[in-house]
Amino acid sequence: MLIPKRTKYRKQHRPDRHGMSKGGNEINFGDFAIQALAPAYVTNRQIEAARIAMTRYIKRGGKVWITIFPDRPLTKHPLGARMGSGKGTPEFWIANVHPGRVMFEIGGVSEDVAREALRRAIDKLPMKCRVIAREGGDI
């Protein structure tokens, strides 16, 4: 699981999901990537599920890069708790993803294998995404 080693504060405000991604919109490491088309909070468990889906499909060939990190805690009150009583306890860690952000990259495999591996990873993510190639266009 991806979580920060330590944070300055235990609880944070919920991040906004408005606007396009300001950085991380291009492929830096691999040949193919997953790009977000809608805003979402991606949890550490969803990132791990997508990573496992990709690596199981490509088996021993290729390399996977994760370019997002869940650095924000999301808090929740327990079920059945009444209103008030302060902010809830941190439940899980999220990465705030804006449209246009590249989240996963893959390299060292053929285009067909990369497309299928990334499609399986997209099924694990909570927002609409697309597969892009290093040349700049859709696959």
From Swiss-Prot:
GO terms for biological process: translation. Pfam families: Ribosomal_L16 (PF00252). Keywords: Ribonucleoprotein, Ribosomal protein, RNA-binding, rRNA-binding, tRNA-binding. InterPro entries: Ribosomal_uL16, Ribosomal_uL16_bact-type, Ribosomal_uL16_CS, Ribosomal_uL16_dom, Ribosomal_uL16_sf. GO terms for molecular function: rRNA binding; structural constituent of ribosome; tRNA binding. The keyword Nucleotide-binding does not apply. Residues 1-16 have a biased composition (Basic residues). Binds 23S rRNA and is also seen to make contacts with the A and possibly P site tRNAs. Part of the 50S ribosomal subunit. Belongs to the universal ribosomal protein uL16 family. This is Large ribosomal subunit protein uL16. It comes from Bifidobacterium animalis subsp. lactis (strain AD011).
